[in-house]
């Protein structure tokens, strides 16, 4: 970079303030943005994590389930620490600690010994196995390894041991979540479908959602409806259990019996279609009842769609309590719309979150001006463009598929916005641009208790409106001249 500006490459302690300022000004320029967007072989700070992280999240969503990493200990520590830092809760998982000999001779012995130790020490009801890079590169055969482990008595013959291939060098955390969830459901429901039997329940798949409050909100809404519910991969208690003097490795999770019987449910609804395409495709071919795929219910319109579909599936009237809740959400939007109207936002994150952010912002009269997804698809781009085209506030907004947070920095420095929505990794770009960052995504490392507030449903609307508008008002109070510092806003 220094060479491109005609500067001598020096140690930072030898660099003058003038030279530093020259580089800073250049990386904020249109010229640099063009070069930044021209790069192809390099990714800088992508807005996603790796497959095994999502696989571990899915495993935590089931009762008595021990996540088991077939791979190196260091990889397992990364997945655990990332979840721990986001939720500020333990994220128990084990690893068979493959090293150099496993890389040469294969990891079967590591897996067998690890499974035997896990059963003896942690006494799980189910072990969910997923892989890191090393066993994927050498081609370890998990089907054969686990079959051999059963035949040799390393794990009880009746203990479910679903597994997923989750190479870190391909896909993202949402793909790992999808693969692990699919494997768990295939394993638990095998041979459990009964002709003519119907549990009368709604099976709900929330997608790769890292907000525990969202799961509780789904359960509360269905309780208002009087609809019996099975949440497939329920992390609400796994990562938000009470501090009451006791600790369990296996707090919460969907009961295995309920998950096994979910194949006989009345209907199955996925609210994270971009996070669970393989799982939902298999469910449509194998599960009884009706199958519905809807966007994550962020904002009024998407929440309405979920509410009306549940009412249709179960032939129920929408409860008055939910109608009142909707009215309060609309009232909150009306009270606050003048503080968001016309504001420009840069948004980034997982596909399902992006659809939700964009829908919500358009409803508030704001502009989702720059939309960045690090692993997007043509289908996602088409859906987002449809949302933009359907609103006057989408005019001039642009979608950037398969771009990273360094691309996003160039965008907000050359074409400024009023705020960003995403996760903690965007704080550096937000600081450089001098704008607020609203941490509604994953991971959130630098704020506390964010996962305890819903983003979905009518309550989610009220929460996001409140957070965003009050921050704008705070900023106005902090930066205005004394003569404009008023009691009323």
Predicted regions and their residues:
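An N-terminal assembly and electron-transfer interface module characteristic of large anaerobic redox
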Residues: 1-489
């Amino acid at each position: 970079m220094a060479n491109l500006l005609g500067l001598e490459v020096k140690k930072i302690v030898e660099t003058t303030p003038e030279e530093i300022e020259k580089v800073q000004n250049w990386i904020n320029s249109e010229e640099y943005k063009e070069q930044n967007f021209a790069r192809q072989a390099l990714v800088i700070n992508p807005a996603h994590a790796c497959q095994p992280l999502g696989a571990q999240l899915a495993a935590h969503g089931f009762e008595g389930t021990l996540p088991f990493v077939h791979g190196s200990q260091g990889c397992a520590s990364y997945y655990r620490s990332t979840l721990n830092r986001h939720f500020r809760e333990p994220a128990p998982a084990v690893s068979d600690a493959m090293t150099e000999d496993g890389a040469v001779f294969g990891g079967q012995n590591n897996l067998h010994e690890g499974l035997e130790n896990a059963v003896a020490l942690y006494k799980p009801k189910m072990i969910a196995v997923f892989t890191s890079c090393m066993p994927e590169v050498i081609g370890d055969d998990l089907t054969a390894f686990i079959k051999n482990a059963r035949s040799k008595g390393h794990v009880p013959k009746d203990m479910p041991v679903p597994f997923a291939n989750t190479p870190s060098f391909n896909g993202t955390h949402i793909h790992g979540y999808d693969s692990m969830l699919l494997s768990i459901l295939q394993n638990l429901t095998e041979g459990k479908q009964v002709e003519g039997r119907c549990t009368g329940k709604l099976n709900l798949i929330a997608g790769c959602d890292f907000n525990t409050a969202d799961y509780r909100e789904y359960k509360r809404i269905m309780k208002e409806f009087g609809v019996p519910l099975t949440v497939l991969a329920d992390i609400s208690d796994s990562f938000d259990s009470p501090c009451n003097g006791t600790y369990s490795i296996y707090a919460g999770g969907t009961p295995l019996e309920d998950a096994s019987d979910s194949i006989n449910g009345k209907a199955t609804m996925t609210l994270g279609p971009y996070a669970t395409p393989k799982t939902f495709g298999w469910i449509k071919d194998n599960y009884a009842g009706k199958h519905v795929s809807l966007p994550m219910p962020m904002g009024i319109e998407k929440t309405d769609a979920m509410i009306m579909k549940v009412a249709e599936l179960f032939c129920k009237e929408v409860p008055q309590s939910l109608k009142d809740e909707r009215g309060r959400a609309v009232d909150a939007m009306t009270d606050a719309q003048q503080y968001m109207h016309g504001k420009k936002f840069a948004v980034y994150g997982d596909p399902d979150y992006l659809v939700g952010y964009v829908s919500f912002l358009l409803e508030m009269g704001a502009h989702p001006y720059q939309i960045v997804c690090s692993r997007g698809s043509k289908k996602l781009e088409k859906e987002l463009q449809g949302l933009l085209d359907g609103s006057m506030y989408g005019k001039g907004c642009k979608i950037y598929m398969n771009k990273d947070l360094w691309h996003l920095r160039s965008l907000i420095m050359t074409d400024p916005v009023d705020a960003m929505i995403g996760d903690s990794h965007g704080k550096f770009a937000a600081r450089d641009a001098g704008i607020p960052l609203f941490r509604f995504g994953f991971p959130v490392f630098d704020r506390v208790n964010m996962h305890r507030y819903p983003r979905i449903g009518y309550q989610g609307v009220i929460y996001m409106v409140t957070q965003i508008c009050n921050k704008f008002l705070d900023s106005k109070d902090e930066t205005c001249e004394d003569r404009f510092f008023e009691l009323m806003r």
